[in-house]
């Protein structure tokens, strides 16, 4: 069974990134076991490889970090559960298929949200996980941005639990103008991070066997 490691407090993004990269190298060179980091970051904007500088609107005193993950700009901060799976897609029980991996991530998060009574969706041509907030109007509740090195995955998923959503106004999230962002709290679901973590671990084992 894959070990989930919760990093305490509000983790610095760059420190966590180095932790991930070091462990990815160990999986590749030393065949270390797969693990999943659960993180709650201090406030930071991160940019993926497809970012456009004009999508960074007004970041104030929040640091901006340019990363090697896929995607565009997003925000990380307190109240957001960030999940970093370090999985070896080249292992016998996995598949060397990045699209399939992302699809499985989506299914994992959708099933976890469904446990709390939240009906979530994927939308064609829009990365991430979405919920309907009004008729024909959707808001993003989770962002996905991954990277793979020699078929070992890192970066991952960020789910808004009780995030300060006003911080997303400093960017165009994921490059989608006029898109809404939401959280479990905003949807009326108040859950402790530890309780949410139990569910994502249970649901992970159903999808990534």
Swiss-Prot record:
Protein name: Octanoyltransferase
E.C. number(s) listed in UniProt: 2.3.1.181
Recorded superkingdom: Bacteria
Source species taxonomy: Bacteria, Pseudomonadati, Pseudomonadota, Alphaproteobacteria, Rickettsiales
Subcellular location: Cytoplasm
Miscellaneous information on this protein: In the reaction, the free carboxyl group of octanoic acid is attached via an amide linkage to the epsilon-amino group of a specific lysine residue of lipoyl domains of lipoate-dependent enzymes.
Residues of the active site: 174
Organism this protein belongs to: Rickettsia conorii (strain ATCC VR-613 / Malish 7)
Family the entry assigns: Belongs to the LipB family.
Metabolic or biological pathway, per its Swiss-Prot or TrEMBL entry: Protein modification; protein lipoylation via endogenous pathway; protein N(6)-(lipoyl)lysine from octanoyl-[acyl-carrier-protein]: step 1/2
């Amino acid at each position: 069974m894959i070990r989930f490691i919760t990093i305490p407090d509000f983790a610095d993004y760059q420190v966590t990134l180095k932790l991930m990269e070091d462990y990815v190298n160990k999986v590749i060179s030393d065949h270390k076991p797969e693990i999943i980091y659960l993180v709650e970051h201090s406030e930071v904007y991160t940019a993926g490889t497809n970012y456009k500088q004009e999508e960074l609107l007004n970041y104030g005193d929040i640091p901006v970090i340019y990363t090697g993950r896929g995607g565009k700009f997003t925000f990380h901060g307190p109240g957001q559960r960030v999940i970093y799976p370090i999985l070896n897609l080249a292992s016998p029980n996995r598949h060397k298929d990045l699209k399939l991996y992302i699809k499985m991530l989506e299914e994992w998060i959708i099933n976890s949200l469904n446990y709390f009574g939240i009906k979530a969706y994927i939308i064609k041509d829009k990365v991430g996980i979405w919920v309907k907030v009004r008729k024909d109007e959707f808001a993003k509740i989770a962002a996905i941005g991954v990277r793979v090195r020699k078929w070992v995955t890192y970066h991952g998923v960020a789910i808004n639990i009780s995030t300060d959503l006003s911080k997303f106004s400093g960017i165009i999230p994921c490059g989608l103008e006029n898109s809404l962002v939401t959280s479990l709290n905003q949807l009326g679901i108040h859950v402790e991070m530890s309780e949410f973590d139990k569910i994502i671990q249970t649901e992970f084992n159903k999808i990534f066997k």
